[in-house]
Amino acid sequence: MIEALLAARPGRAALIIVLSVLLTAPAWRDATAEEYPSRTISLVVAYPAGGGVDTVGRVIAQKLSEALGQQVVVVNRPGGGSVIGTRDVAKAQPDGYTLLLMVTGAALPANPGYDIDKDFSAIGLVASVPVVIMSNPSLPAKSLAEVIALAKKEGAKLTVGTPPSPTLNYFAAEQFKAMTGTDITIVTYKGTGPLTNDLVGGHVMLAFNTLPPAIGNIQSGALRAIAVGSPSRVAALPDVPTIAESGLPELEIVQYYGLVAPAATPQPIVERLNAELRKILTSEDVKKRLMDAGGDAMPSTPAEYARNIQHEEGKWHAVIKKLGLVVN
């Protein structure tokens, strides 16, 4: 029939076919979105297992699995700060089956092999997690003022552990040195899990560490929280002052975790994932689990998360430039 139409009246037949395709295309797109997901989804965590990002990632993966009816599996791809895992997701197929739990600071490495503004589609914020200045309990300083006084006295003999450059923790430690005029020695670790273990063991005496991998040790007394980097105190540690309260109001250190997908991921899939993520983050169960881990749930729209990425990455780029730090 189509061949006959084309032979008889090619212009009209072509128009009919084109109109038919245009009219049915939305239905195809809707069907694709409705069928998603039809197989396992990989949630890439660009940090080692056992660390703070991994802890939050596993909470979200479990709940997304339940909501979507397909397994969401955490895949740890650490290396280069967060460069390796982040770059892998940037180059993945934009089909909704490879996601990334992105953390503030992903745009800070030099020449990472991806563009934070062009290579990702923001899905939504997940949580805010403060960086905490914490110590081995044998350190004689119990407040931030005492830590600063001790740092001025001990100088390079006082060691402070952080994850590697280019992470927020590392740059915050450098900012702390500059603001306080101290010369403490920064020791970098592959992740927050190994850092926490060495801090408990007394191999390093002070740390700029995220809360999730250390909160149990803080609550048991194996570690001491000196000050939290969030604007206000955290519910999990209500007696621990903020860094601002402790005398350094310009030193705010908060990591924002969020879900992103490769750029060009179909908008219906992004919207589906955002809708499920927001439901998850408003559930009392997840809010409590994140709070117990030292974070706060932060449901958002994709646009709100995109603005957060731009603001936070810009803020830390300015810190790096001001301090004259070299980023590898």
Model-inferred region functions:
Residues 253-261, 291-298:
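A short small-residue
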Residues 38-40, 179, 242-245, 267-328:
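An extracytoplasmic/periplasmic, membrane-proximal ligand-sensing/linker region
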Residues 11-27:
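Bacterial N-terminal signal peptides
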Residues 1-9:
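N-terminal secretory signal peptides that target proteins for export/translocation
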Residues 147, 151, 250, 256-284:
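Bilobed periplasmic-binding protein/Venus flytrap-like ligand-binding cleft at the lobe interface
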Residues 34-257:
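Conserved hydrophobic/amphipathic secondary-structure segments
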Residues 1, 15-16, 268, 279:
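Generic short N-terminal amphipathic or hydrophobic helices
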